[in-house]
Amino acid sequence: MENQLWQNTLRCCEQYQESPQDAENILFLLLGLIILVNISINVATAMWQGLQNAIDKMIFWMNQKTEVVQVTECPPKEPQPANVQDVHIHCILDPVQVKMAQPTQCSSSSSHYFCKRSNDRRSRRRYGYQQGNLQIHQSSQQQGCLSHQQRLRNRPLSRGYPPFRKQPQGHKMSQMRPMPFFDMEDRDSLPEGHSCPHAKQPRRGWGSLCKPVRLASNVGLWGRQGGILASLPLPSLYLSPELRRLPKRVEAKSELRLQGFGPHYSQSRIWGTVEAEQWASSPPPPRRLLPNPSWVTVGYSSFPSGGHIPYDARDQWRRGTEGCEPPPAFVPRNPREVQGYRDHNSQAHRQNFSSHTHSQPNHSPPQSMGHVGYSSRESHEVRRRAPDWIEVFPSRHPLTTSTSLTALGEASYQRAPPASSGLMIPHSSQRLAEVQISDPTPPPTTFVPLSRNPGGNATYQVYDSLELKRQVQENRGRASSLPPPSTSASRPSLHRSRTGKLN
């Protein structure tokens, strides 16, 4: 019995030990199942993403293929609106880059009116170039037309003149301009040694009178109410649409380059010869005929201030006909000959110019150039041609009304030589003694702009329109305060550029 009981107890213990092992096995199975489920879920998601990407690529490729097939089979008649792009071009009219040029044809009524007036005098005209951004021409008239010239110069500009004269057509312009003006490069961009058209283009001959063109503005030609600079339109005109609607070809340029192209030119002479300046950058060949001193236009001195003087073209021609060799192109200064010449001719000039003292302050005969040497034959020639000066140049109006930057009272002929030369100028007349002003320090010849550079690759300087307007108003106020022109001394010599105001 005891053995049987012992076996029963052993069986119970074995059963108790087997039950916890079964529970542990069940737990391990559950954990294994959970891990397997997670792994399967991750694998399933990864496979689904890959499958989805593959499906998307396949759909995109199929769509592209269908679009290409549709385009090749039936091309669209009109472009897609989504592919159309609007192109906007904005053009800005810069007042600095605009140029004033002569119209090739009379396209307006005012130009037509001027063409009719210029046809009857075309046989008497000669044209000449003026260096600078303001290239202007004016027809010349023969001597003996004093009253007619006065009427032309003093005529008010309310009759509808065009801004510039029409250039004559035909062989004259073909000789003076071998290539069209607008086909050339900008003259300001040329170097100073090659910017003067005198050395490049042939002339019709210096025997004829070359005068500046009449500017058609409401301020007068000779600066009685402002001159060339005041005749420029206001800066607002360049920005207005009226400028674009002009019937004739217009390139307005609001700059004035008034620069001398030689070391012997002074700024005062440049400013005093805005209307008529025959620029010369280098001495011309000796065979070329130079301007006649007895035909020099108003405000222009054919004698450079460096002590050399070109010979008279008419005198050259006369000597050539007599069988003499033409004289050299330049004559060195000789103070002793000048002294004798001035003493010899003082009486003749006092008699010839007594009635024109109010109109001849800056274009007196060559006697005022004290550093110029003359022979006895040349002195007789100049004295014989003194009446030519009286007939050619009309009486100019006094500066009591207004002046401009074109210093009309500039005594370019009466500039005294430097004090170092030691030359005593005899007082041939009261007019010379009053007008002459000594300038011991030569003015600078470099061109200094008033305001700014236009920028870009341009090498030229420009004047600001506001600065020009201010200086014109200042000159008008200055001229209104001048005394009445009782004598020639009432017209002062406006050496404004020498003081650095205009430079």
From Swiss-Prot:
Its main location: membrane. It holds the Pfam family Spem1. The chain crosses the membrane at residues 26-46. GO terms for cellular component: membrane. InterPro entries: SPEM1_N (IPR031368). The keyword Transmembrane applies. It comes from the Eukaryota. Residues 348-367 have a biased composition (Polar residues). This is Uncharacterized protein SPEM2. Keywords: Membrane, Transmembrane, Transmembrane helix. PANTHER family: SPEM FAMILY MEMBER 2 (PTHR34834:SF2), SPERMATID MATURATION PROTEIN 1 (PTHR34834). Residues 493-503 have a biased composition (Basic residues). Residues 311-322, 334-346 have a biased composition (Basic and acidic residues). The gene is Spem2. Residues 155-176, 311-381, 436-456, 472-503 are annotated as: Disordered. It is a single-pass membrane protein. It is found in: Membrane. The keyword tRNA-binding does not apply.
